[in-house]
């Protein structure tokens, strides 16, 4: 059995990136919550 995490930069940004977060209402909510918390890094 292989490891479950097979890192891919393209897939990472497609799923967790800034533009994908901005594209949905829920994603924008996530970003605003992270801004409110004061996160230095908002998305992957």
Curated annotation (Swiss-Prot):
Residues 1-44 are annotated as: Disordered. One of its GO terms (cellular component) is ribosome. It comes from the Bacteria. One of its GO terms (biological process) is translation. InterPro entries: Ribosomal_bL34, Ribosomal_bL34_CS. Residues 9-19, 31-44 have a biased composition (Basic residues). Keywords: Ribonucleoprotein, Ribosomal protein. GO terms for molecular function: structural constituent of ribosome. Belongs to the bacterial ribosomal protein bL34 family. This is Large ribosomal subunit protein bL34. It comes from Lachnospira eligens (strain ATCC 27750 / DSM 3376 / VPI C15-48 / C15-B4). The gene is rpmH.
């Amino acid at each position: 059995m292989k490891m479950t995490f097979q890192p891919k930069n393209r897939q990472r940004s497609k799923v967790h990136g800034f533009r994908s977060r901005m594209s949905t209402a829920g994603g924008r909510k996530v970003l605003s919550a992270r801004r409110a918390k004061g996160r230095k890094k908002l998305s992957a």
